[in-house]
Design a protein with these regions (language model features):
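Short, membrane-interfacial amphipathic segments enriched in basic
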Residues: 1-6, 163, 167
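Membrane-interacting alpha-helical segments
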Residues: 2-9, 13, 153, 222-225
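Alpha-helical transmembrane segments of multi-pass membrane transporters/translocases
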Residues: 2-3, 19-21, 25, 237-285
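Membrane-interface helix starts
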Residues: 10-26, 184
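Membrane-helix interface segments
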Residues: 17-18, 99-105, 182-186
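Secretory targeting signals
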Residues: 28-80, 105-181, 209, 213-261
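Aromatic-anchored segments of alpha-helical transmembrane domains
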Residues: 28-34, 192-202
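Transmembrane helix boundary and interhelical loop/hinge segments in multi-pass membrane proteins
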Residues: 77-101
Length: 285
């Protein structure tokens, strides 16, 4: 398996798709930071004190699996993985004596590395540019779809959940890419699932805030979504109000955090095991 992973790293260094994705991610990060920076410059003229282009704002916003680069990563991973089958790379690995178990788990490991390398580069550049233009304050304000101050606890919690979420997305992507082995149908399936998980959590969170207006059946349904959606807390972290100051702040409760950690680990294990079992039974042409 070590040799298979080394072969993946060697191919990745020469892969045009990976390089193009890195360039696109860099361009998107620079473009986003510049847009927010110039908006901040314009808002200075109307006495708007809050900054949009800050390290903490870009950190939180860049983690979303539903934003432009978050969706580009699984699309490119699908292409990369399907080519392993269509170009005969997987078949050659079997011919040279590698077991299907080693091959599939090397695909999983390679997919995770592929995904995390791209996301670390993108998020790191976003945070770096935001920090240069507007500073980074671990207790500062985040401006976006949800506004509020952050804390070091919130930042590390959402960072851990994002890490697990992208590992889950990578494993799910490898599952469908190795099962379908065709880019055409695989891309919409994966993207639709990501959007359902992400926006399903957002909608469920908004509806849950209605409280007593909802009936018991709807409350139970929304609670079930919370426990089965692997992207729930990443999409639906709450904006709380400090009763003493009236200021809003972003928070992920310990219960929600550990629910999502366990949830993601279960999904990762299920897709890995299911994909491995299916891969062992299918012929590779």
């Amino acid at each position: 398996m070590r040799n298979l992973f080394k072969a993946f790293i060697f191919r990745l260094r020469k892969d045009l798709t990976f390089r193009i994705t890195l360039i696109v991610g860099g361009a998107l990060a620079v473009g986003l930071a510049l847009i927010l920076f110039f908006i901040d410059l314009g808002l200075k003229n109307v006495d708007f004190d809050m900054k949009l282009c800050t390290g903490q704002t870009l950190f939180v916003s860049s983690l979303s699996p539903a934003q432009n680069f978050g969706l580009a990563v699984p699309i490119n991973l699908i292409t990369f993985t399907v080519l392993e089958f269509t170009q005969g790379t997987i078949r050659n690995k079997i011919i040279t004596g590698n077991s299907k178990t080693k091959i599939y788990f090397s695909l999983i490991l390679s997919g995770i590395v592929f995904t995390l390398l791209l996301m670390f580069a993108y998020v790191g550049l976003c945070v770096g540019l935001g920090s240069i233009f507007g500073g980074f304050d671990p207790h500062g304000m985040v401006m976006g779809l949800v506004n509020g101050t952050v804390s070091p606890e919130f930042l590390w919690k959402i960072g851990v959940l994002a890490l697990l979420a992208y590992i889950f997305i990578a494993v799910m992507t490898i599952f469908f890419a190795s099962l379908i082995r065709n880019v055409g149908p695989c891309i919409p399936i994966v993207i639709i699932l990501i959007m359902i998980f992400y926006f399903g959590g957002t909608i469920a969170s908004v509806m849950s805030a209605l409280g007593e207006i909802l009936g018991d059946g709807m409350k139970n349904f929304l609670l079930a979504i919370k426990y089965i959606d692997p992207l729930y807390s990443l999409a639906a972290f709450s904006s709380e109000v400090d009763p003493n100051t009236g200021a809003s702040y972003l928070a992920i409760s310990n219960a929600d955090f550990w629910t999502e950690v366990i949830n993601n680990l279960i999904y990762i294990a299920a897709f890995t095991l299911g994909g491995w079992l299916l891969f062992r039974k299918r012929d590779v042409k």
